[in-house]
Structures are given as structure tokens and as C-alpha cells.
Amino acid sequence: MFNRKTLLCTILLVLQAVIRSFCEDASNLAPVIIEHPIDVVVSRGSPATLNCGAKPSTAKITWYKDGQPVITNKEQVNSHRIVLDTGSLFLLKVNSGKNGKDSDAGAYYCVASNEHGEVKSNEGSLKLAMLREDFRVRPRTVQALGGEMAVLECSPPRGFPEPVVSWRKDDKELRIQDMPRYTLHSDGNLIIDPVDRSDSGTYQCVANNMVGERVSNPARLSVFEKPKFEQEPKDMTVDVGAAVLFDCRVTGDPQPQITWKRKNEPMPVTRAYIAKDNRGLRIERVQPSDEGEYVCYARNPAGTLEASAHLRVQAPPSFQTKPADQSVPAGGTATFECTLVGQPSPAYFWSKEGQQDLLFPSYVSADGRTKVSPTGTLTIEEVRQVDEGAYVCAGMNSAGSSLSKAALKVTTKAVTGNTPAKPPPTIEHGHQNQTLMVGSSAILPCQASGKPTPGISWLRDGLPIDITDSRISQHSTGSLHIADLKKPDTGVYTCIAKNEDGESTWSASLTVEDHTSNAQFVRMPDPSNFPSSPTQPIIVNVTDTEVELHWNAPSTSGAGPITGYIIQYYSPDLGQTWFNIPDYVASTEYRIKGLKPSHSYMFVIRAENEKGIGTPSVSSALVTTSKPAAQVALSDKNKMDMAIAEKRLTSEQLIKLEEVKTINSTAVRLFWKKRKLEELIDGYYIKWRGPPRTNDNQYVNVTSPSTENYVVSNLMPFTNYEFFVIPYHSGVHSIHGAPSNSMDVLTAEAPPSLPPEDVRIRMLNLTTLRISWKAPKADGINGILKGFQIVIVGQAPNNNRNITTNERAASVTLFHLVTGMTYKIRVAARSNGGVGVSHGTSEVIMNQDTLEKHLAAQQENESFLYGLINKSHVPVIVIVAILIIFVVIIIAYCYWRNSRNSDGKDRSFIKINDGSVHMASNNLWDVAQNPNQNPMYNTAGRMTMNNRNGQALYSLTPNAQDFFNNCDDYSGTMHRPGSEHHYHYAQLTGGPGNAMSTFYGNQYHDDPSPYATTTLVLSNQQPAWLNDKMLRAPAMPTNPVPPEPPARYADHTAGRRSRSSRASDGRGTLNGGLHHRTSGSQRSDSPPHTDVSYVQLHSSDGTGSSKERTGERRTPPNKTLMDFIPPPPSNPPPPGGHVYDDIFQTATRRQLNRGSTPREDTYDSVSDGAFARVDVNARPTSRNRNLGGRPLKGKRDDDSQRSSLMMDDDGGSSEADGENSEGDVPRGGVRKAVPRMGISASTLAHSCYGTNGTAQRFRSIPRNNGIVTQEQT
């Protein structure tokens, strides 16, 4: 330990001695610069220091500027340049000198020296900072639009160092780094994007460096805001005489000026003015002529703005012609005129006082006697006593309602006690409701009795039937026979038995349906199934308004037990016909109420079972009701009370219908208010124009007078209704008040109630299945058709599939199904209301037996001519006419083609115009000796398409035969008239030589690869060389000219491979270049994958582009000298006298005879026929439909759903040509009902609302435009 300390001390003493010796020797060494001067920038008049340090410290320091010694305080006492003890040069006040002289600015260095030597430091510059006064670009006043970009320009004064630019707004520094909309450009410009009104103000540009700062002149930024609506005018609906205000408020900077104009009409200046506070346009005392469009214009320096609103003027209905009272003898005709005007045009109806039935325009009763013309005239023919009463004509629109009443009095001969009453004819057997198949026959029996024998006539929907129709005949018994039924034969048929004593009627419906529908076909039972006649009714008790009857049941009940009885009566005081008692009668005794005092009555009874109605009993004795006591006094009081109530309820509109709101597909809620308090209102009738409810009611009775809203249910889905409310007073007789205004409403959509039609399931092979269908009828869609849902259920969960298509799809194809497995398939339509009912469950077993059955059915369907001839509804003459027209078209086309090319008829060559380019006036036919070895040529009839590596773009799928179509029928364009112009094929640069498919038409390749969802994507990937759209010049001929065209051009069918040979090598084409391929592999137990095929039409220019080319000619390439000189042969010419010489000399002589200026070639426009021929039955997808079947410009197939319009094997599409929503499927406007007899049969036609007794219903909406069209369906 001691030795270590001793050693350490010794080392330290040695080091100390060495250091001391070195320091003493350093003063004896040459100097060394230890601190060099650095660049300095200083402003004029400021001090500055240039440092310089050297070792040893005794070294002399000398300063130089720009290579010259610096005069310091050592040389000149009063110099402002001072050398410090450390050697640094201190400038007390930097001088800029005059005109650059005596300036302190320059390059400085110091020199350290002693007797041992000297050393020079690095140079350091002293630069003078400066900042000029004037800005190179001064800010200017800027006006900008709000929301756009504003630029305040500024270029700072010249200075050194470069001045830093900042900005002030309203004398406050802008912190641009904290303002995201502000940007300071490198050149000093201030950019505000987007500019806002808050940015308005005074801006100054500030330039700073070490010299100081410069502030620019102030510049004003004015931000103008374009006019913007705070409140746009809205459409207004007002009543005549009211005032209306169109509120139009606009903001902007400066405040916009507002002006009003009326579109295409003068402004009602005497009644229109700008409201206070400039709130809008106000029109006083609105008139119907004021209806129109009013436009609010707002304008300021930043721009203009306009908005319009429509004024709809409502005027309640008023009568131009009121109905007048009439007195008509029995059997005569009563006519009531009724004309109303209003804004909008009022809807009107007739009703008989005391009855709920509404008779709208075009109404025809079941017996045809009562009619309402489209103009509103009510006509009652063959007037009867029962027609007597008051008839009300009511008009209504959204503004209000009005009504007028007229009385009908029927005069008849009095029946005395000595004059026996002879009842009208009685119909023994009548027809029943029937549903029959199209093409079958119908017999409608009508056997009547009476003295004298009554005549029988028939009506359909209230109109006489045309017996002259060869299909319709009437038997001697009165029965109606209709052969070969058609759908227009559907309707309500009424039999009328008439003699001099009166008439009787019997009505029932006949419905005709296709065999493909799901309707239940019902034919009328044999009359032996009906009950026999009950016994003659016995009158037990008679009062002034009631009669009690007793009778016995019939001896035989027919094919079933008696379910009830029907009572009919005849009154000579009420009219010469039988009337029905509407009540349900279950027993053999009944008290009839509501009869008229002092009236005579006669009764008959009919029994009814579930099969139908039996024959009538013997009529009862004639009975007369009694006259009640104090009848006169009560009548006067009642009449007075009724008159008061009627005046108060009908003189003005008491109810205002405010809103009708849709609740769901079958229910709506009505809201109404009383315009004034009326104590006589005891309830309301809610009525409507539209289909009846499902329970056949056309109105709703609201019995509480305090109720102000009500839900009407059991309506039809997706149907338009027009509702109104009628108040009533329930006194001795019910009095109906004036109806309210009317309002329209559309019920919501519901799931389709009908399944898709014509669902077909067909096996293509043991693993492929095709499902096709047609859309259901329009009246069963219950909304807008959105598509279809196909459910496929296998025997294992991974074999199930749920496919959803759009509304235009008509089929799907399932691939890679499991052989031997049983699949259950359901197809249903869907709307916005949901998925509807399916067609049922179809089971398919994927085995050989099923396949053979399906293939046999397919072969039978392919016999198109056989099916056409056997269609009973297609006359042979139509087929002959079509064939004649077809032949005439072909002859005309051939004549036209020949006339176009008449100048080349002497040539033996064939004009080729199938995608090649017309290059010269007289080129000789050029073809390789071995075309199979020359990659430039390819038979135009074989439309193949190869990819870049030479392999076909068509690849085999597991079921290749499903995709292969024989292309022998689409042999290009080889057969063309002769012409002196000859053509070369245009080579496609960059592609294989034999890859020509009718020129360079753009090819689309469908990819039926499996997918797990219902969205399919169209593959548009193409080889790069297919995108080359340039025309390429033809290659020069390299072989001798043959004496005639090669055999393969003369007969394009020669040497063509068979279909099987092409299929075997994996190559084939479909529809002229449309290829199907699959990628990947599928396990046998994988879920079924679907594919839907598109049929793509090529555009007329052959490039695959979607540009329409109507009458456009292709511009040919510029001709060169080589186009007019025949190429030299590649082989020696043949011996003299060969036909080659004759051809060549002839051609050369003709060429020389043309002179120096060759004749211009005549170029045919590239026709559609020159490109890929597609299957004549093929159509573009429904998304690409356009004129000529070409896709719209700039549009692509909708890839969201590739459900296709697949073609049936018989050439037809499984989808209707029109869209599903376009189908005109009539909805039966008449509800099927049990047969009706007598006058109450007219209730069958109460559902015959609207025009021609049909429902006003929305038809399904078309997909191209999205507009709802309302029409009678």
C-alpha cells in the first residue's frame, strides 16, 4: 500500500515538471489562431465586434479589411475602430460611408505574428443590415364573396436580412398560426379561405428585420355574402276571398334587394304589395285568376337568388245547374241535371234521401235502369213507385261542399178492391256466382214464369249484352250460353224477365281466370242440389208498418240442409217488380217491419242451402197495411221538425275535414272539426270514393257527435281513397247534412298477396338447376315491386341459400348442386311492404330420372312451330301474313344491297366489310397460301377471342355444355356482294395474330363464379391489347395473287369444325364473343352457387364503346403511294399465259387509265352487321336497355345485382317484355257476391265506383323514372 502511494506521487511530480517546461517553451513558438472572426450583420450606427484570439498571448494582432490593413485607434486616436487587448476588433459605430466609400462593410481577417512567425485567420464578413421604406407591392382594397377565397397581396420592401412579413387587422396583430382559415404565403400574401363576414376590416402588411419595421398603408377587406334565404316562400292554398302571404326573407351583405314577379302572368297590382318589414308578398281578396307561380328575386353585388311558390286558389263547389223536381208516370224516364263549378274541379255524387248508397259519375245500376253520366246527369229509366223520393246532388272538393235536392214523384193507377193485383213475372231458377277457366264455356240459366209469358233479356255490368257475338247465344228457355270464355267476359250478369205486368231481375257474377292463376274454379251446381219450394206463406198479423208471416219448410232440402230463407215482396203501390227483404231469416216465421201504411203487399218465400237458392213458393194473398191513428197531426209536426233540421244541416257546410293520415296498409285516421256548434248533429257518416272495405261496407257510422277523429280500417293496401264526412240528425227520419270537404289519401304498401306466376324449375344437368318465373299480377303486388326472393333448402344447412333479386330479374341458375340431394324451392315477390306469399314449395331430386324428364320437356318446348300451330287463338292467316312480310323484307334488303354495289357485279370476288379497313381503290385479293400458318388472317365466321398468351378466353366450366352455343349460325359477314374494292384484314397490334373477333370489338366476359351473397359483380377485365382503339394499316401481301378467292372464302362453311370438336378442346364462343368462364373449383358438398347471365350487345363501331353512331362514317387512314402500287410477289411468277397475268394486266391497265389523280374511294359506314352477331333472341340487360339495344353513353351495367333476363330455350324470355310494373292487369271492380234477385240486386254494383265501375288504384311504378302514375286499372 505504501509503495502504491509513493509511485503515484512520483508520477504527478514528473507530469508537473513536464507541463511547466512546455509552458515556458511555448512563448518561444510561432503564434496559433485559436478564435477566428465570424460573419456579422449589423445595422448602420450600431456597434459591432469581430473576435480574434491567438496563442501565445504576446502575439501581435493586425486586422485587414478587403485585404487592406484596418486603421484602428492605434494608428488614429479618434478612429471608431478599436483593437481590444484580446485581439478583437470593436467598431464603436458602424459606418456605411458615402457612396460605398469608407464603409465598414467588408471581409475581415486578423494576422497574429511574433518573432517566430505569423498566422492568418479565416475571413469573417461584416454586412450592413438595411430595410427600404417602400413596399414593392402594397395591399389594396379587396371585395370577396363569403365562402370563397380572398387574397390580400403584399410584397415587403427590399432589405437585408430579408424582412419577415406579418399582418395586422384593425391595428391588432394577427396570430396566423392560430387561425386555420388564414395562410401566409411565402411571398407575403395573406390568403383567407374560406372568407367569412367576420373577416371584414382594415388590414396592414408589416415587414420586420433587425433594422426595424415597415407598415403598409391600410387596405379594406369587404366580404360580401351572396343572398341566402332565411325563409323561402312556400306553396300556399287559400280560399277565394282570403288573404295570402308569401314569406320571403333573405340575408346577405350588403342587404339584398327583394323583388317579386309572377311567372307568365301579370301581378294583381291593386291587391298585391310588399308586407311590412319586407317579410314577403301579400295578396288581399284572392281571386281564382290569381292562381299561379310567384317568384321572389333577391339581389346584391355578390349575386342573385330566386325561389318560387305556387298559389292554389280554392273555391268551394257552386251550382251552375240545380236539379229540378219532376213528376213522371210509372214506366217513364226521369232525368235530373246537375252542374257544379269550383276550384279545384269538384267531385260530385248522387244519393237518394234515406239511403247510404252513393252514385258517382259513370255509375250504372245492376238492372241498368239508373245511370249517372260522366257530366253528372242522373237518369232513371222505366220509373217505378219505389224510385219515388228525394234525390240529392252533392259536390265537394278540398275547399268545401255544396248540395241540392230534387223530388221525384211517380204517378200510378190506383188499385181498387175490384181490380185484382197481377204480380210481375217470377224467376224460378237463376244463375249463381261462377269462376271458370279461359277457353271453357258458361251457361247462365234464367227460367221465369208469368202470364203472359215474360221475355228474357241480359245485362253485363248494367249494359245490354251483344247477342250478335258468335260466342254468345240465348236459349229458348232464356238461359245465356257463352262459348270460348275470355277474360273480358268477367262481370255481373243480370237476367231480366219482363211482361206487361212488370219485371223481375236476378244478378250474379261470372269470373274468368287463366289456368296459371291460383283462383279456385267454381261452376254452378245442378238445380237438383237446391231446395224445393216452401209452402205458401200465411199472413198472421197486420199493422200499419208490420206484417207477420208463417210457412212450412220445403219437402226436400237438396244437397244440404236448409241454411235460411229469402223473403220477396211485391206492392202495386211501389212498382211492378219484386223486392228483397235484406234481413237474414233462419226460421219459418218472420215479422216484416218498415212497411208503408195503407200499402198493399204480396209475399213469396225461397229456401237456401249451401249450394244455392231454390224455387219460390206460391205467392201469398194480397194484404193492405192499416192507417195509423192521428196520422195527419203527427205528419204535420214531423214535417215541421224535419224541415227545420234539414235547413240547419244542409244550408251550409258544418264539418271541416282537416287531415287524413295513413296508419298502415289497411287503415287511415280522419281528423275533422265543427265549423260551428250545431246541437242537431247526432253523428257522422264517413264515406269515401274508392274500393269498399273487405266487409263490403262503403261507409262508417260514427254515432258520437263529440268525436272528432276516427280510424277507418279494412281498406285495401296501396290504394287511393277520397274521404269526406257527412253529419246527420237521427229524428223520425234520418237527415243528412252537407258533406265536408274531401281529402285524398294513399294507403301504405303491403306484402304481395299473389305469388309469382309461371314458376318453372328445370335441371340442366346433374349439378345445375335453373329457376324462372314471371311477376305476379299488378293487383296482387300491393305496392311497388322491388324484386323477388328465392329460398333453396337442401338436406344440410350448408346447402341452403336465400337469394334476393331486383324487380327485373326473371330467372336464376344454381351451379354445383349435390347430385342425389333433394332441394325444396320457394319463389316469392317482395315490395316495400315485405315479402309476399310464395308460389308453393317445389321439390327437385338431383338425379338422372329428374334430368331426363326435364330434358324431354325442354325438347318438346323447343318445337316452336308445333306450338304455334296448335295455339287455338292464333289463326293460320296471321302466320302466313308474318311469313309474307318477312320474305318481302328480305327481298327488299337484298335489292338494296345489290343496288349499292352494282358497279362490281362483274367481279368474281367477295366484298369483305366485316371489321376490315378499306385501304385502296383496286387492291388485288391477297391471301396467304396457307392461311392456317399466317397469324394475320382468321376466318371471320369463327368469332374466337384469345388472350395475350394465345389461350382462349373461354375456359371450361364443370358443365361446359351449359354455356356453349353453336356459332355456325353467326358466321360473320362473309357473304357480301361483289365489288371492285378489296379489303385486307386490319391487324390488331399488340395481340396475337389470330385474335380477331369481328375487328376489335370490346369483349365482355361474364364470370359465373360462386358467391355467398346475392350481389354479383360483372367482370370487365380485358387483355391490354383489346383496349387498343386505333385503326392499324393492313400488312402488305406476301404471296402471288390467286386466280379466284380461296375455297374457304367462297364457301365459308367448308372446313368448319363440328360443335363437339370445338367443345372438346375447351374453345367456344357465345353470341359473337360473349364468353362465360368459371374460376376456382367447387367441392361437391359446397353450397349451391348461382349465376345469372347477361347478354351484351356490341356497339355499332365495333370498339365496345357505348357511343351512339347514327349515320356516322368511319374516316379511313390517309392513302400513300403504296396503296396504289401492287406489292411484288414473294415467289417467281408462273409461266406465261397463266390466269395471273390476265388478272394483273387487267388490273394494271385499269389503274393506269385512271390518270394521275386517282378516283376517291367510296367508303361504307361501318354497319352494325359488320361486327359481332349476337343471338337473335338475345337482349341487353334490363339496366342497359336503350334505343337499338345499346348501352347508354357513359353508363355501365348496374353491378349491384346480376340477376338476369335469361333466355328460355324456346327463344323467349322468362320475363315479360315490359317491366313488371308496366303490366296492365285489370282489377275486378265488382266484388263477387251471392246471386241477387229483385231490386236489391243493385247493391252488387255499389262497389262499381269511379269510371266504368272500377277501382282507382295505383299501378306499380316504372324503375327508369321514379314517377307514380295513377290510372284506372
Curated annotation (Swiss-Prot):
GO terms for molecular function: axon guidance receptor activity. SUPFAM superfamilies: Fibronectin type III, Immunoglobulin. InterPro entries: FN3_dom, FN3_sf, Ig-like_dom, Ig-like_dom_sf, Ig-like_fold, Ig_I-set, Ig_sub, Ig_sub2. GO terms for cellular component: axon; cytosol; plasma membrane. Residues 533-628, 653-750, 755-849 form the Fibronectin type-III domain. The keyword Oxidoreductase does not apply. Residues 1207-1222 have a biased composition (Acidic residues). It is a single-pass membrane protein. Residues 1037-1046, 1125-1136 have a biased composition (Pro residues). Residues 1096-1105, 1145-1156, 1240-1273 have a biased composition (Polar residues). Keywords: Disulfide bond, Immunoglobulin domain, Membrane, Repeat, Signal, Transmembrane, Transmembrane helix. Disulfide bonds join 52-110, 154-205, 248-296, 338-393, 446-495. Its main location: membrane. Expressed in the AVG interneuron and the male-specific sensory neuron HOA. The keyword Transmembrane applies. GO terms for biological process: axon guidance; cell-cell adhesion; dorsal/ventral axon guidance; neuron migration; regulation of sensory neuron axon guidance; Roundabout signaling pathway; sensory neuron axon guidance. This is Protein sax-3. It comes from Caenorhabditis elegans.
